[in-house]
Amino acid sequence: MNNPQPPHQPTESGTVRAELRRERAELIARFRERPEVHRLLTGMVRITNRSLITLWRDSGMPTDCCLAAVGGYGRGELQPHSDVDLVILVPDSEAVHRIKSIETFVGQCWDVGLVIGHSVRTVEQCLTEAAIDVTVQTSLLE
């Protein structure tokens, strides 16, 4: 059973896109002035987190779904031109076909300029895939 989420005012994707571009440009400009790699990579994560949280909330995802960062992004290091690796965890395999908000969320990510690599799986499917594919296992571990 889904718990109702508190009402909120959805954010325009154009606003998220503009904020994302501005924050990225500022971060890269600071990096050029003072090249601290760790600050750049973690700053990219922070900026991306903010955008994803807004888009996730605005897409109306059910509360029994979960967004997980994997790969380098999950490790807390995101290169400026890297894709954002995500797993959308759903409660059961049937949920994938009935959750329209997954399509909304993924589309909004692309619309605002986040290049995402994503999969939609149950926890059980993650474990099964990780057992047969070392790249999935590594990505989940990161």
Regions found by a protein language model. Give the residues of each.
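N-terminal regions immediately upstream of nucleotidyltransferase
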Residues: 1-63, 81
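Short, functional N-terminal and low-complexity linear motifs
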Residues: 13-23, 71-75, 123-124, 140-142
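A sequence-composition feature that detects small, non-aromatic residues
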Residues: 18, 25, 29, 68-69, ...
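Hydrophobic/basic alpha-helical segments enriched in Actinobacteria
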Residues: 23, 40, 94-97, 101-102
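Preference for short coil/turn "hinge" residues that link or interrupt alpha-helices
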Residues: 33, 40, 66, 71-74, ...
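Solvent-exposed, flexible loop/coil residues
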Residues: 35, 77, 82, 120, ...
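Conserved catalytic core of two-metal-ion nucleotidyltransferases
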Residues: 38, 46-53, 59, 99-142
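Active-site nucleotide-donor binding segment shared across nucleotidyl transfer reactions
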Residues: 48-99
